[in-house]
Regions:
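Extracytoplasmic gate region of multi-pass secondary transporters
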Residues: 33-34, 229-287, 348, 352, ...
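Helix-breaking motifs and short loop linkers at transmembrane-helix boundaries and internal kinks
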Residues: 45, 77, 98-104, 115, ...
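Central cavity-lining transmembrane alpha-helices of secondary-active solute carriers
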Residues: 56-71, 275-289
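Conserved MFS/SLC helix-loop-helix module at the cytosolic interface between two early adjacent transmembrane helices
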Residues: 64-103
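Structural signature of the two symmetry-related core transmembrane helices
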Residues: 80-94, 305-322
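Cytoplasmic helix-loop-helix junction between adjacent transmembrane helices
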Residues: 108-149
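Helix-loop-helix hairpin linking two adjacent transmembrane segments in secondary transporters
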Residues: 143-196
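A late C-terminal transmembrane helix in Major Facilitator Superfamily
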Residues: 356-393
Length: 441
């Protein structure tokens, strides 16, 4: 019998916080461009369409490298990939700070996408290793809520630097933060089996609770990728999570611009107002998508019903963005956007945690790569489509309508396609033979 959690050491939660800090830093790396956008637009005479392309530049490489990054992650492990990825975040932000125009900024953002591609799958994989299933929503919510919280502290921090020192300093600050995290990660992170600070009691507790086994996929990662791409459960999760991603990335990239253009705020005003919905989103992510979900499952409620209920309810609340269309009152606009982001944030860690909950041995990074690849295609689509819609119509109404339609598609996928939330069976029969053949080559 596993001892009660109150008697178990808490090394795993130190790792959880470390992962959260990493996501916090790499999302500040991303949002600095949206805060600097008004100054960049003025200095380089950028059109809304060009600005949309700059917003999406990061996601071209980030998305395209999600699946390869997941394969590399499953092959070389969280520790090595996480270390060098964090170092390259700093390099990319520094290059952005010294760029002299559209081309240089675009190239630096593409490099940032390359550097950060393995980051989220690495957090998902590490969480699977370090936490039993009964703590998976809370542990996932730590790093997932950090993505939202980055807007709470990152937007004002970067805005202050940009307004007082110039836009280049906004990127310089994020370069320093990335370098500091690289050092911390190098010193602290190890997988459970090699962490000398992890006690046997806690290790046994993690393993007995259903943590994802360490190790590589049978037959190699390429064969596992083909097997998982034929699985309905993987596609149900992928489509649903990507639908959430469209709205998330719309707000992540365009919220400051919406506040400046539609509500006629300056940079500091927009930064202040933008922190409000992201603050509520951070709390919703952590306490509803994390603690509440784990609590209900621990009380004996059906795991699939609990997780799907939060997914559907959260994405339905995301439709509240329509309320912002018909108002020019800043208070009402932010209220509607806050409701939408709060709902979406509650669904986010639930969807993200499903990656490790359905993964077969050695497949967490690969499923994470698949899910994050399609999710981040939305990171390309949302800012570009929004930029073109706003450029043509001079309004965000059409952009918000498109986001709502995408959310409805995601709800359908979660309800109908995903099925029960349980591990994908390890390959058998023909699939096992294919994997064995791949291993022998």
């Amino acid at each position: 019998m596993v001892p009660g959690s109150q008697r178990i050491p808490r090394r795993r939660w130190i790792i959880g916080v470390l992962l959260g800090v990493g996501v916090l830093v790499n999302y500040i790396d991303r949002i600095n461009l949206s805060v600097a956008a008004p100054q960049l637009q003025k200095e380089f005479s950028l059109s809304p369409e060009e600005l949309g392309l700059l917003f999406s530049a990061f996601f071209w490489s980030y998305s395209l490298l999600q699946v390869p990054g997941g394969l590399v992650l499953d092959r070389f492990g969280v520790k090595k990939v996480g270390r060098w990825g964090a170092f390259l975040w700093a390099v990319a932000s520094a290059l952005t700070a010294i760029s002299s125009g559209f081309g240089g900024i675009f190239a630096a953002r593409v490099l940032l996408g390359v550097a950060e591609a393995p980051a989220f799958p690495a957090s998902q994989k590490a969480t699977g290793y370090w936490f039993p299933t009964g703590e998976r929503s809370r542990s996932t919510a730590i790093f997932d809520s950090a993505a939202k919280f980055s807007n709470v502290i990152g937007v004002p921090l970067v805005a202050f630097a940009i307004v007082n020192l110039g836009w280049r300093w906004g990127f310089g600050i994020t370069a320093v933060l990335s370098l500091a995290f690289f050092i911390a990660y190098w010193l602290i992170y190890r997988d459970p089996s090699e962490d000398k600070r992890l006690t046997k009691t806690e290790y046994d507790y993690i393993r007995a609770g259903g943590a994802t086994p360490e190790g590589i996929a049978k037959g190699g990662q390429g064969a596992m990728l083909g097997y998982l791409l034929r699985n309905r459960k993987v596609w149900g999760l992928t489509i649903g999570f990507s639908a959430y991603g469209y709205s998330f990335y719309l707000f992540l990239t365009w919220l400051p611009g919406y506040l400046v253009q539609t509500l006629h705020m300056n940079i500091m005003q927009s930064a202040g107002y933008a922190t409000i919905p992201w603050m509520f989103a951070s709390l919703s992510d952590l306490f509803i998508g994390g603690f509440l979900v784990d609590h209900l499952i621990a009380k004996g409620y059906d795991e699939t019903k609990v997780r799907k209920s939060v997914l559907v309810a959260g994405m339905l609340l995301g439709l509240a963005v329509f309320g912002a269309v018909g108002t020019t009152d800043p208070v009402w606009a932010i209220t509607w956007i806050t409701i939408a982001l709060t709902g979406l944030a509650a669904a986010a860690p639930v969807g993200s945690s499903i990656v490790s909950l359905i993964a077969p041995r050695g497949g967490t990074g690969t499923i994470g790569g698949i899910v994050n690849f399609t999710n981040n295609l939305m990171g390309i689509a949302a800012p570009v489509i929004t930029g073109f819609v706003v450029g043509i119509t001079h309004s965000f109404a059409g952009a918000f309508l498109i986001a709502g339609i995408v959310l409805l598609v995601g709800i359908f996928s979660y309800v109908v396609i995903l099925g029960r939330i349980e591990p994908v069976p390890e390959p058998s029969g023909v699939d096992a033979a294919l994997l064995s053949g791949a291993a022998g080559r």
